[in-house]
Each structure stands twice: as C-alpha cells, then as structure tokens.
Amino acid sequence: MKINSKYLPIVIGAVFALGTVLGSLMNAPVEDQLLAKNYSKTKLNKLIDFINNEYVDSVNTDSIVNLTVDNILSKLDPHSVYIPPSEQAEVAESMKGDFVGIGINFYMYKDSVAIIKPVENGPSAKAGLKSGDRILFAGKTKLFGRRLPSDSLFSKLKGIKGSEIELTVFRKSEQKNLKFKVKRDVIPIKSVDASLMVGNKTGYIKINRFAETTYREFKTGLSRLQKQGIQSLIIDLRDNGGGYMEEAVAVADEFLKDRQLIVFTKSKNGTTDKTFANAGGSFESGKVYVLINENSASASEILAGALQDNDRGTIVGRRSFGKGLVQREMDFNDGSAVRLTVARYYTPTGRSIQKPYKKGNEEYYKESEDRIKSGELYARDSIKVADSLKFKTPKGKIVYGGGGIVPDIFVPIEAEHGNENVAYLLQTGIVGHFVFEELDRNRDAFKGLHFNEFLVKMKSSDTYFRKFQNYILMTGLDLKLDKTKALVNRYITAEFARQLYGELYYYDVSLKEDAMVKAVLSQKK
C-alpha cells in the first residue's frame, strides 16, 4: 500500500508520556532561512551574551535558554513544546518500537529491582532469571538500598546489542544470591497489546500507541484473527494518546475502499494535503467497532474519525480527548528538539476535532476535570456540542467537530469501573503491587496450574478480595469496595493472569465483562 510521504510520525502522548501532549509531525525540515525573518532573535542573543559576560554571579545560560524556549512555546498552544535531550531520546525510543536491553518487566519494590516477569524468549529468560528475582547488582553497580528512578535503572541495564552484563540477583525461593551473565539484545516495545477472539466471529485488537511497528503488529494480529473466521472486529483505542500519523493512516486503509479520504491537513498558507485509501484493504467488508475514551487522542482520533466519517465503523465509548494539531520538529545539536504546530488536521467530513485552547494551557488541561464536573462521563446528554459544528457523513449520520470524537454508542464510566473508588485503584497501580506481593509470598500456590485451572481456583474463593481489602487499609486508603466486589475481583484475577501467564491472558480475563465490549456484542445479537 502507498502512504502519503508528507505525513511523518505524530509523537503524541496526551498527558500520558512526558506530562504534555506531543502532536502530529510532518516530514519537512525547518531551514535556517525560515527563521531569518525573526529579527527579535538578535535581541535574545544579545541578552544571553550580556547575562553570560556581565552577570554578578555564575549562571548556567543553557538553563536560561531552555526556560526562554519553554516560555515562548507555552504562549502559542498546548502542543508546541520543547523537549530536552534526555526526554527526546526516551520518546524516540518508545516510538521506534524497540530498544537494546536485558528484557524484563520490573517494579521498584521497596528498596530493590524486582522482576515481575522476564520477556518471553528474551535475554534474561534465556539466561535463567525468573519472576520474583531481585536484581542487586548490574556489574559492580549497586541497585538496591536506594530509590533509583526508572530511567536511571534502564540506563544501567541497557547497552550495545551483544554486549554482556553480569547480574547478581537474590532468589527468594532459594534464599541465596545467584549470578547470571546476560547478553543484551533488541527488545520489542509492543504497541499492540493483544489480538484475540471475544465472541462468536468477533475479534479484538488493543493498540496502546501508534509506533513505527504498529501497522506491522496490527496486520499480524488481524491476519491471525481472520484465520479464525472473524466477521466483526473491535479496535480498542482507549487510553491511546496517539503516535505516528502514518501508522494510523495505514491501519485505516485496511478498512476503507480505494480513493476514500482518510484525513487532510491545512497549513498557515492555506495549503491542503489529502491522504486517500488505496485498493486492497484486508478488511473492507466486515463490521468494525472502535472503542475510545477521554484519553484517546490525536492519531487515535484520526483513525476513529476516518472510520466514522466514511460510515465504515461504529464508535463506542466516551468523547475523545480533542487533539487536532500537526507539529513539525526542529532538532538542536545538543539532542533537544522543538515541536511547533504548523497545521491542523481534519476528518473526511471536514471537521476539526481540536478542542479550544485560547484561554491558556492551564484551562486547556483542566477541561478533562470539567468533563467530570459536568457529568459528561456519566451521561451522553451532558456532552456539549455546537450545532454550528455539525457535519453529515455520506449516509446522513450527524457528527460533530470542535472537541474530540463523539461516540455513536455511549458507555458511561461507571459501567466500566463501577465507581470512583475502583477507577482510583486502577490509576494508582495498587492492584499490581498487591498481586506481586501475594505471588512473592507464595508463588508455589500457582505452580503448574494451567490457565483454566487458575481461573477455577480464582473463582472458587473470595480470599484474595478480602486480602486486598486489608492491603489497601494498610496503605492508608479507606475505600468501600463491597458493592463492586465482582468488578474488583475481576481486576485482581486479570492482574494475577498478567503476572503469571502474560499480557494476552490479562485481556482474556478482563474483556469477559468489559462494558464497552459487551455493548458491541449486544449490538450484534
């Protein structure tokens, strides 16, 4: 298939990645002459030189420049951002879809690096490391007894492909320290978490972000499901803050017919660039459902909007974030970068889904809180839409612009999470910590159990629910969970499944009673 080469990766992250939303990137270098017209830069340069040469105390002019750049960009829009060198490397790595490391999922548990699960067939698994092992030393570097931030830990464990590192670990089951030599290798950072069957002839694919490898991962998952005879597909974009625009476009192309419009952009000078679908999509006729929520942004909204506006997909969930700006990146010699908004993107019917930002960045991000206060997350009729931003699809369906994708089928937040207490538990990650500690205390209780046997074991007793209630009390949380016992039990079981069997099994458990998935399946009856 051919993708419009004018669209480069959107590296977004709607408040999920770096505490800011990084927007759609277009592939066009910013030439020095484009900046020549900005005569004010002379004033800035003179000021920096004056401070550097004459200020009474020693001062780091680099930090002043960074603050200046930050301040300038913050006055433009919420998505024009400065990215310092350390964060730029992290973003690039995440969106690349892989890195070189030892292949473990871990927690900083109390004062040590605790392995949740080695990556299957990864370097650590091959070397013999196991779930529950504590990494004490990486070479001669001590990794326990202090709180190292995750990025510092990663830097100790990463390296050149093929390089070897000796790890000293404490294995609780044997009550002794062990040494392992681990050869670093390329570790995939999956953007497609799961592809599985969720009903008769219905497949499900979860995309957590749009990275360089997303389209390839998606095609692999879709092909696997098609071999199982799917007639309908659910694409889960909940909490997907975006990613590479061209990857979202490529996914959309699999569902649309030749020459159907996917997305278009408009720049300051009025230039319009359109991207159309090509013939030969692998799922042009089956039913498609897209799950979204208030954290689905940018590239996710491009995909959802393309399918909704072409009457090709049914959107299920809650109004999406509302991120419709396109950025161009300018790199600096120190490894930092600026992403500047240079265009807006529009869905096929011509709507911009960018929410207003004229009142400043603080009000812009506060809008998410306003949705809770207005009741929008609980009732469809609380969604504010303007008649002036009303559009029609080819089949006459009314869709709205001005702030996110409005779903065709609304699913309130309490249908998913029961109440605010449960939603809070999921945000804190406390369920994962509880499960890790339970397994750490008695991993043998699950030893040798096949997955179906595990499910029977978890359903036969409410032991872990009661233990969890005590656990959260000990952490200082006084949350009433009795009314949502079944829901909390499902999350506990799903987390046990993840840590014991892997990510796919988490979804196998959690999707069985998922409110949005159930809404889709009820439509098909």
Model feature map: region roles:
Residues 59-88:
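N-terminal, post-signal-peptide region of Sec/Tat-exported proteins
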Residues 28-40, 44, 48, 52, ...:
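Cleft-lining beta-strand/loop regions that shape enzyme active-site pockets
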Residues 9-25:
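Hydrophobic membrane-insertion alpha-helices, especially the h-region
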Residues 299, 311, 318, 322-389:
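Polar, glycine-rich mid-to-C-terminal structural blocks
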Residues 78-114:
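PDZ/PDZ-like peptide-tail recognition elements
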